[in-house]
From Swiss-Prot:
Belongs to the Bowman-Birk serine protease inhibitor family. Keywords: Disulfide bond, Protease inhibitor, Serine protease inhibitor. InterPro entries: Bowman-Birk_prot_inh (IPR035995), Prot_inh_BBI (IPR000877). Inhibits trypsin (IC(50)=6.20 nM), neutrophil elastase (ELANE) and, to a lesser extent, alpha-chymotrypsin (IC(50)=3.44 uM). CDD domains: BBI. Pfam families: Bowman-Birk_leg. One of its GO terms (molecular function) is serine-type endopeptidase inhibitor activity. This is Bowman-Birk type proteinase inhibitor 1. The keyword Disulfide bond applies. GO terms for biological process: negative regulation of endopeptidase activity. The keyword Disulfide bond applies. It comes from Lathyrus sativus (White vetchling). SMART domains: BowB.
Length: 53
C-alpha cells in the first residue's frame, strides 16, 4: 500500500546538525522494512516524519 510514505522506525530521533539528520532507533537499529530513508521535518524541534523507498 501507500504505507511507505509514513512508515518509519519505532523511535526516530533527529540530530541537532544543520540540516538535521534522522536517526532511526529501532529494535534492529534500522528503518522500517518498507523504508530506505527517513527525513526530518523543518519544524522546531525537528521530527522524523517522511520515509522514502
Amino acid at each position: 500500500g501507500d504505507d511507505v510514505k509514513s512508515a518509519c522506525c519505532d523511535t526516530c530521533l533527529c540530530t541537532k546538525s544543520n540540516p538535521p539528520i534522522c536517526r532511526c532507533v529501532d529494535i534492529r537499529e534500522t528503518c522500517h522494512s518498507a523504508c530506505n530513508s527517513c527525513v526530518c521535518t523543518a519544524s522546531i524541534p525537528p521530527q522524523c516524519r517522511f520515509c522514502y523507498k
